[in-house]
Amino acid sequence: MPDLRLKVTRVKDGDTIVAEAQNGDTVDVRVWGIDAPETSQPYGTAATNLARDVVGEEVVDIDVMDTDRYGRVIARVQANGTDLGRTLARRGLAWHARRYPTSSTIKEQERDARAEARGLWTQDDPTPPWEHRGTSA
């Protein structure tokens, strides 16, 4: 059973959504286990669009893992049984997050996407989002 069921009101980027509780409160949710390219990076728009396709305006299941320094909930996000983090990693539109413990499944999804040159892995040397932002992972 999920910790929360919320309605997605906005997809900010590939790994961040805004969702609304039944009482009208909104929550910024960072997708656990991945780091998607920033919208200003190659494949950032593709990651955002895929996130919209998977969770846009859906009621999603939120399994809270943590909160970050910005006050966002760090959570597994699923819509209709589809895990957003795993889907982005499998399509080659996210790295597994180095700063948080990540499931072995997400690491495997990234490894397979790299091996099969999917998404951002078609680039010779893609810049991870944490380097693009100038932060450590």
Residue ranges of model-derived segments:
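Small beta-barrel nucleic-acid-binding modules, primarily SNase/OB-fold domains
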Residues: 1-137
